[in-house]
Regions:
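Sec-dependent signal peptide recognition
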Residues: 2-11
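N-terminal signal peptide c-region/cleavage motif recognized by signal peptidases
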Residues: 16-18
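Cleaved targeting-peptide boundary
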Residues: 21-29
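An aromatic/glycine/proline-enriched structural segment found at the starts
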Residues: 23, 203, 207-211, 220, ...
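M16 family metallopeptidases and their MPP-like homologs
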Residues: 44, 49-65, 71-73, 89-202, ...
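Catalytic Zn2+-binding segment of zinc metalloproteases
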Residues: 78-88
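A conserved hydrophobic secondary-structure block that centers on an alpha-helix together
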Residues: 261-268
Length: 508
């Protein structure tokens, strides 16, 4: 059992303090307690607050998926909202045998799918040829599962968890799954935090995967909605080109993945990763560590420590050559984009790239405007849905135009500016402005219990919550020499992916 407190002298009321000061401290009075079963508890006490932002984080996400089942982690999040024997069940004694029969029938279906693997395998580039789309036995088993699911639906009550939370003043009931994490969260009156603990302890151990195929179709609808955005297919094509092996770059399921989801695989993910020694409870608000230790022990203390989950093995090969994408689309605005792989959180260089991102946003826009190339410049570290990872990801420099006339000139200008930054220092004024912008963003986030909770939890799953404060401090210590060094080291041709969007029929 360990117990830590990190404190600084600076309170959040100092948001307006002199940003030009050389030393900046960050108020992170985080207390940590680790229970015997490995469950971690983090608390920021805010005396006087009558509410608390509560989240439970699990170190599991899209990284842990296998090919052909991408999106399975996100799907598991949906299933874990479907209740337990005590939440959402109208008659559990009648429902349980039906659930058992569904699982047994699915097991038989998996065996039949495996037996018929050569018959039903997709053999066409354009998904247009299988010897057989199904077998009579697969059809029969699926119909039996559908019949059983309808019986189960008659025995369940939708939205039980939501009703509990709303009945006791809960707001912001959300959940999210990304590459490295899943979290469930709620904002509650501080004196109602037991509701959260009771529900989440139950969810961690007793989740029932109800309405499996109905939820599968919700993911299909979400995927269709995503693909209807003009830039979605382009972004996925770029991410697939930047990353060769890492699941960081994979989407939340291709359309071909959804049909492959099974209760058996979802149960494997659930049993493997949703365990006390792979989870962290975080509270920011009007609670104390002493009271939360007692409450968490009451609801989670009896849960058994399990074997450590399988770690993620994927690792990108060393950068070995420039890659290019020509993406043709008549609706998406023409653009040129440069992407470079950068290190993940926990690497000593990573905080400096936050500063570089801010510097480059202003510098590239000014440079293109001064050369009368113009365009709308966007500098980002967003990969799929997330800006930060504990693994290598990428930084992007994009310029968007109304037509293709200036794309080549824009690419040349951005490459020239990057080359210049590898040879000459930026101005001290540019550096200070970027650092001030980052501090302002941090203080705004830290003043919101929910956003602060997210940042602490995100760093915990990427590396450690203890990395957060040094990370922020390192950004303030970034020098012009650091910027030049990293541009020279990382922004090289062998580590570069270039994408261009042009209309169909344009170019070669």
């Amino acid at each position: 059992m360990r117990y830590f407190i990190i404190k600084s002298l600076m309170a959040l009321t100092f948001v307006g303090a002199n940003a030009a000061a050389q030393d900046h401290e960050y108020d992170l009075p985080i207390k940590e307690h680790i229970f015997e079963n490995g469950l971690k508890l983090l608390v920021i006490e805010r005396p006087g607050d009558n509410r608390v932002a509560a989240k439970i984080w699990t170190d599991m996400g899209a990284l842990n998926e296998i090919s052909g089942e991408y999106g399975a982690a996100h799907f598991l999040e949906h299933l874990m909202f479907k209740g337990t024997p005590t939440l959402g069940a109208r008659d559990w004694e009648t429902e349980k045998p039906l659930i058992d029969e569904i699982n047994a029938t699915e097991k038989a279906m998996i065996a039949e799918l495996n037996r018929a693997r050569n018959d039903i395998r997709e053999r066409g580039v354009f998904h247009d040829y299988q010897h057989e789309k199904t077998t009579p036995e697969i059809t029969r088993l699926q119909k039996h599962i559908d019949d059983l699911e309808r019986k189960v639906e008659d025995l369940t009550v939708e939205g039980t968890t939501m009703k509990w939370y709303q009945g006791f003043g809960g707001t912001r009931l959300t959940a999210s799954t990304e590459q490295e994490y899943m979290h469930f969260d709620i904002d509650l009156p501080a004196n109602r935090v037991d509701i959260f603990l009771r529900i989440e302890a139950d969810r961690m151990t007793n989740a029932i995967f109800r309405k499996f195929d109905a939820e599968r179709m919700i993911l299909v609808e979400q995927r269709i909605g995503f693909l209807n955005r003009l830039n979605s297919r382009y972004l996925e094509a770029m991410e697939a080109l930047v990353g060769r092996t890492s699941n960081v770059y994979n989407p939340e399921g291709y359309m071909t993945d959804f049909k492959n989801y099974t209760r058996q695989y979802e149960r494997y993910l659930y049993d493997t990763y949703f365990i006390p020694n792979n989870s962290t409870l975080i509270f920011v608000g009007g609670v104390t560590m002493d009271e939360m230790i007692l409450k968490v022990e009451k609801y989670f203390g009896g849960l058994e420590r399990k074997p450590e989950p399988t770690r993620y093995y994927g690792q990108e090969p060393l950068p070995s050559g420039e890659k290019r994408l020509i993406y043709r689309d008549n609706k998406l605005s023409p653009r040129v984009e440069l992407r470079y792989q950068i290190p993940g959180v926990g690497h000593p260089d990573k905080p400096h790239f936050d500063v570089i991102k801010e510097v480059m946003q202003n510098r590239l826009q000014k440079n293109l405007d001064d050369k009368e190339i113009g365009g709308s410049v966007n500098v980002s570290t967003m990969v799929v849905h997330t800006n930060n990872y504990g693994l290598p990801s990428s930084i992007h420099f994009a310029a968007i135009y109304e037509d293709t006339e200036k794309l080549d000139a824009s690419e040349e200008a951005m490459l020239a500016e990057i080359k210049l930054l590898s040879e000459e220092n930026i101005s001290d004024k540019e550096l200070k402005f970027a650092q001030k912008t980052l501090r302002t963003q941090w203080y705004r986030a830290a003043s919101d219990p929910n956003r602060l909770n997210f940042l602490i939890g995100h760093f915990e799953v990427m590396d450690s919550w203890k990395t957060l404060k040094p990370y922020l401090e390192t950004r303030d210590k970034t020098t012009v020499e650091d910027v030049r060094r990293l541009v020279k080291q990382y922004f090289i041709s062998d580590n570069r992916t270039i994408g261009k969007v042009i209309p169909r029929g344009a170019g070669q």
